[in-house]
Amino acid sequence: MKRIKSFFKILGMLVLCASFTGCGVNGNIDDYAVNTGYGDSDTVKSSSGVSRDSIKVGVIHLSDPAEGSGYTYTHDIGIMGMQQNLGLSDSQIIRKINVNDSDKEATRKAIKECIDEGCNIIFSTSWGYMETTAQMAEEYPDVYFSHGTGYMSNGKNFNNYFGRIYQPRYLSGIVAGMNTKTNKIGYVAAMGSENSEVTGGIDAFALGVYSVNPSAQIYVKVTNSWYDPAAEKAAASTLLDMNCDVITQHCDTTYPQLLAQQKNVYSIGYNSDMSKDAPDACLCSVIWNWSAYYTAAVQSVIDGTWDGSNYYGGMNEIGRAHV
């Protein structure tokens, strides 16, 4: 069993990483995105830059990156990577943590605090921040806003960024399909069929599974929250009780991985490398490298080359695969 698991860890190291490099913010336009923010959607370039020494960067986080794994953690790793790449000081990074993305007032307050503290560009990292970010972008045209996931933008001072995560999702499905013995694979999903980000990942994962194991079935449990430790734990527990012997996830905590390890079955992590959390269960993880985009976006504000275009990078831009 250890030899088989080692093989799949090597496979994971080779292929399961969504690492998006940035030759420029406008280098990776979403083929399907439309400007659906508030106001005029004509794409324009920023007229002047901001000095590297004076720029301030705000980031709105859904949870606390100190948790050490998962969605917010990997975004903050990206922010720290950008900070190092550009030589910014700690005082130039303004973080707002544990901002509930379903609470528009809390979102607005966090963004306004970043503006009041002098931020030139603000990254709002969760889907639910979208509409409030769009509104704030119209109210503060001299500040740049970049929303992670979602679909709204205005082609001026407000864009959206994401990546083709369906690509490594497909590859992780291959790993799952080759490892299941019961032909039951569990998927803990943050949102249901109304959310294209989640359903696109499930579809890609399923296609990967079926490419190597057409007899396998995938069971999905929805938590209806991007971050809900109790709900994620309950969903994973239900899937394990259904005799699923591989568990994967599109949610923020490591509970699905930890429960899989407790049940002595396999798991596939998401967002960050979750093998450190469940080393005996986690075959591989679908990992984001956000620092590439964050570096390019902030650099464009410094240089005065921001043009409001959307970003949708893919695995063809990987400089190096890692888990």
Q: Each predicted region: which residue ranges?
A:
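N-terminal hydrophobic targeting signals that begin at the initiator methionine
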Residues: 1-2, 24
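Short, aromatic- and cysteine-enriched interfacial helices/patches
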Residues: 8, 25-27
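Prokaryotic Sec-type signal peptides and long signal-anchor helices
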Residues: 11-12, 209
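C-terminal motif of bacterial Sec signal peptides marking the signal peptidase cleavage site
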Residues: 18-22
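A residue-level marker of the well-folded mature domains of exported/periplasmic proteins
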Residues: 27-322
